[in-house]
């Protein structure tokens, strides 16, 4: 299985596409599609039929669609910049992610 440097609840910035420059939180990582769902980014309108069994109303709804994982970059909380992510081990042997710009540990 593929390993991505982006995880759920990471703060990311979109670096390519129609929403370039927008910042959002990762809602879901889709490894089979090489994609991510980012909160309030890549919004589309869908015409939904009402489903009484699920108590779903019909109408036009707005929802997020997946972005390719290569079009987003992790944003460091410490330096507030889009950054590459590296891995290293702490003194107690735990593997952690860190910001390659400021060397701070990422959540």
Curated annotation (Swiss-Prot):
A single MF term (Gene Ontology): structural constituent of ribosome
GO biological process assignments: translation
A Pfam family it matches: KOW
Highest taxon of source: Bacteria
GO cellular component terms, A-Z: ribonucleoprotein complex; ribosome
Entry keyword set: Ribonucleoprotein, Ribosomal protein, RNA-binding, rRNA-binding
CDD domains noted in UniProt: KOW_RPL26
InterPro entries linked: KOW, Rib_uL2_dom2, Ribosomal_uL24, Ribosomal_uL24_CS, Ribosomal_uL24_KOW, Translation_prot_SH3-like_sf
Summary of the function given for this chain in its UniProt record: One of two assembly initiator proteins, it binds directly to the 5'-end of the 23S rRNA, where it nucleates assembly of the 50S subunit.
UniProt subunit comment: Part of the 50S ribosomal subunit.
Family that this chain belongs to: Belongs to the universal ribosomal protein uL24 family.
The protein, known as: Large ribosomal subunit protein uL24
Organism the protein comes from: Nitratidesulfovibrio vulgaris (strain DSM 19637 / Miyazaki F) (Desulfovibrio vulgaris)
Gene: rplX
